[in-house]
Amino acid sequence: MNKVVLLCRPGFEKECAAEITDKAGRQEIFGFARVKENAGYVIYECYQAEDGDKLIRELPFSSLIFARQWFVVGELLQHLPPEDRITPIVGMLQGVVEKGGELRVEVADTNESKELLKFCRKFTVPLRAALRDAGVLANYETPKRPVVHVFFIAPGCCYTGYSYSNNNSPFYMGIPRLKFPADAPSRSTLKLEEAFHVFIPADEWDERLANGMWAVDLGACPGGWTYQLVKRNMWVYSVDNGPMAQSLMDTGQVTWLREDGFKFRPTRNNISWMVCDMVEKPAKVAALMAQWLVNGWCRETIFNLKLPMKKRYEEVSHNLAYIQAQLDEHGINAQIQARQLYHDREEVTVHVRRIWAAVGGRRDER
């Protein structure tokens, strides 16, 4: 199995392909990407037969920006007979996966695939039963075993394969299912909520998104991102010349500062979170974020980088490399992750977490 399917946002196939070609090459796994415009997925075909499995084992999925999900697959199954689609699929997976922990029958996230998605949901139940009988799936769902993927690209036409549950997206089609809160001031609130789900392990939420923390929201108006922080009972400085939603101000948890987010300097030294979703050139935002991190003004940050029309992967890579270089220059250890989230459009969301030193007394430990 030498092919890896990567699901992505439709229209960003070239960026996804450029990224996987670059990062697979750094792992000395060579191949080429098959790209179809607006398909919502990319296929990376490795030159060596076993390299597909090697790639999804060795390259951290968390290091990918434009892929929502990935899995290794075999050859395309075509012309599945409508009266029995199950037998050929089971045949393709036998000997490839044994006692898988979960089945996901998926499609690309395109308008054309919506009808196909309805079929996939109905088809999952009988297929799961057949795969369990064949030993491809375990008799119960478990996160400790590989995930079995059946990926339909057209009616009667699918790829079959698997991903490793410790190195994939835990979400179906790589998309967290979030509901827009009726009392949120703007739909942008879902970007930050999704970022929390993608970047912060669920078992660390109570510690890292704790009650009573102090946070700053740069470019906050009307308060979509502030809403998420308030919902987690944080105290928030919302920085923007534009007005904040009255519903947020009424909570008593928000201090509205009518200032430019680029000029604001915090007066507290116990700020846990800084978030930022400003419409500005990505290099300018990256420089501001680096300044906050280098000065120890916050412990963690989530921010958006708006993408240019061309060379998007190169631009994001350059911005992330700049932040990393600034941190390295000042001897600061940090973890950087970036992802084009489902709720992002022409942008990517970045999470940076400073890793505290064991030696006390430094400003960045306050």
Swiss-Prot record:
<protein>
    <recommendedName>
        <fullName>Ribosomal RNA large subunit methyltransferase M</fullName>
        <ecNumber>2.1.1.186</ecNumber>
    </recommendedName>
</protein>
<feature type="active site" description="Proton acceptor">
    <location>
        <position position="306"/>
    </location>
</feature>
<dbReference type="GO" id="GO:0008757">
    <property type="term" value="F:S-adenosylmethionine-dependent methyltransferase activity"/>
</dbReference>
<keyword id="KW-0963">Cytoplasm</keyword>
<feature type="binding site">
    <location>
        <position position="260"/>
    </location>
    <ligand>
        <name>S-adenosyl-L-methionine</name>
    </ligand>
</feature>
<dbReference type="GO" id="GO:0005737">
    <property type="term" value="C:cytoplasm"/>
</dbReference>
<dbReference type="InterPro" id="IPR002877">
    <property type="entry name" value="RNA_MeTrfase_FtsJ_dom"/>
</dbReference>
<dbReference type="GO" id="GO:0032259">
    <property type="term" value="P:methylation"/>
</dbReference>
<keyword id="KW-0949">S-adenosyl-L-methionine</keyword>
<dbReference type="Pfam" id="PF01728">
    <property type="entry name" value="FtsJ"/>
</dbReference>
<comment type="similarity">
    <text>Belongs to the class I-like SAM-binding methyltransferase superfamily. RNA methyltransferase RlmE family. RlmM subfamily.</text>
</comment>
<comment type="subunit">
    <text>Monomer.</text>
</comment>
<feature type="binding site">
    <location>
        <position position="277"/>
    </location>
    <ligand>
        <name>S-adenosyl-L-methionine</name>
    </ligand>
</feature>
<dbReference type="InterPro" id="IPR040739">
    <property type="entry name" value="RlmM_FDX"/>
</dbReference>
<feature type="binding site">
    <location>
        <position position="240"/>
    </location>
    <ligand>
        <name>S-adenosyl-L-methionine</name>
    </ligand>
</feature>
<feature type="binding site">
    <location>
        <begin position="221"/>
        <end position="224"/>
    </location>
    <ligand>
        <name>S-adenosyl-L-methionine</name>
    </ligand>
</feature>
<keyword id="KW-0808">Transferase</keyword>
<dbReference type="GO" id="GO:0006364">
    <property type="term" value="P:rRNA processing"/>
</dbReference>
<keyword id="KW-0489">Methyltransferase</keyword>
<dbReference type="InterPro" id="IPR011224">
    <property type="entry name" value="rRNA_MeTrfase_M"/>
</dbReference>
<comment type="function">
    <text>Catalyzes the 2'-O-methylation at nucleotide C2498 in 23S rRNA.</text>
</comment>
<dbReference type="Pfam" id="PF21239">
    <property type="entry name" value="RLMM_N"/>
</dbReference>
<feature type="binding site">
    <location>
        <position position="188"/>
    </location>
    <ligand>
        <name>S-adenosyl-L-methionine</name>
    </ligand>
</feature>
<dbReference type="InterPro" id="IPR029063">
    <property type="entry name" value="SAM-dependent_MTases_sf"/>
</dbReference>
<dbReference type="Pfam" id="PF18125">
    <property type="entry name" value="RlmM_FDX"/>
</dbReference>
<keyword id="KW-0698">rRNA processing</keyword>
<dbReference type="InterPro" id="IPR048646">
    <property type="entry name" value="RlmM_THUMP-like"/>
</dbReference>
